[in-house]
Amino acid sequence: MVKGKMFGNGVLYPIVGFASCVAFVYLSFGDLWINIHSDVRLSFVERNGTQFIVDGKPFYFNGWNSYWMMDQAVDESRKHRIRAILQAGAKMGLTVCRTWAFNDGDYNALQISPGRFNERVFRSLDYVIAEARRNGIRLMLCLVNNLQAYGGKTQYVKWAWDEGVGLSSSNDSFFYDPSTRRYFKNYVKTVLTRKNTITGVEYRDDPTIFAWELINEPRCITDKSGDTLQDWIEEMSAFVKSVDRNHLLTVGLEGFYGPKSPKRLTVNPEFWASDIGTDFIRNSKLSTIDFASVHIYPDHWTHNPDFEYKLKFVYKWMLSHIEDGDKELKKPIMFTEFGLSTENKDFTPAQRDRFMKVILEIMYKSAIKNRSGGGSLVWQFLVEGMEEFNDDFGIVPWQRPSTYNLFTEQSCRLAMVQGALPTQMNYLKKLCTRRK
């Protein structure tokens, strides 16, 4: 999501009660500061058909987005926020966090210009990865933004244009201009082969990284056929795999169906979604793409303000994509962003909790049935004092006990289905009561 730099009615859905199986533990900010051993052992996440696998066992996960971590780690006075949010996630039983591994030509830029990097910012990303490992959290790292926030494809096009080699000033030329493709490949190789100054491990050899994401929310509206974006995905995914054979890779799609999937077009939120140059099934079907990503933003995607309509859309949207994973793609489906805007008319936190509960319930049912819905990441978690990063989706989880409880319940339920990871054991003992 990231808007800027900081930037059928009456349908009821059955929700399985679980409060009796969970002991809710409230976190105060002061509780977050705990000692964690640095010798946490993590294994690479792999794929076996439609399931994620860790140490040979199915891995269904519960997680969150905190896109801002590298940016905040640059400033010593704000560095504590990274440790706080990662420790909070671990205490909630969460296992995966998605964040940005890019900042192109902007304030605190990682990539100052094509091929020029800020070592101070790179060390901040080193710190984020090292802290995630210490807390037993795996990171999903995104490599560029389709949006202008943190530079994105707009910055790559500007670089090529300023150097007199750009084919067009259109942002979409990022996908077809040989110069921007070359810039991006160089960036990708530099990041993947980076040796962490704290751990001494190259990123491509570090199991702390759950997966790479090519681009956040790609769209290419100048080519509605989808051919331009498809060609870019084919080239870039093959390139990533040539550099890093250890990690999983996804595109970063929102999940919209395109012209190659005519029978699925009615699942899209509105007609415009099939005309933005993306095609969920086509883009995700490549052999170099290990799993598919989907976002869930019914209030931003539809004009219908009715809350029950939004829940109905979420239900249909998620089940359609899980079915795609099971039958068409035969790959895991990861819901990498979901949120409900606080700017909606008549918004209440209770309404948002209900929205999230529907999503988490669908994911739980996917886990107990061994389906392709592999995990979900809420957008977004913050710590106190981050108002400038709070788009209309930000949540400080320990300030909302009901919201906090939803996620801890989900962690406990998933652990009961698949067993707890070694990195979760101590926290889950505190969160989850035993079934009688």
Regions found by a protein language model. Name each.
Residues 33-332, 338-354, 358-363, 367-427, ...:
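Active-site mouth of glycoside hydrolases
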Residues 2-33:
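N-terminal signal-anchor transmembrane helix specifying type II single-pass membrane topology
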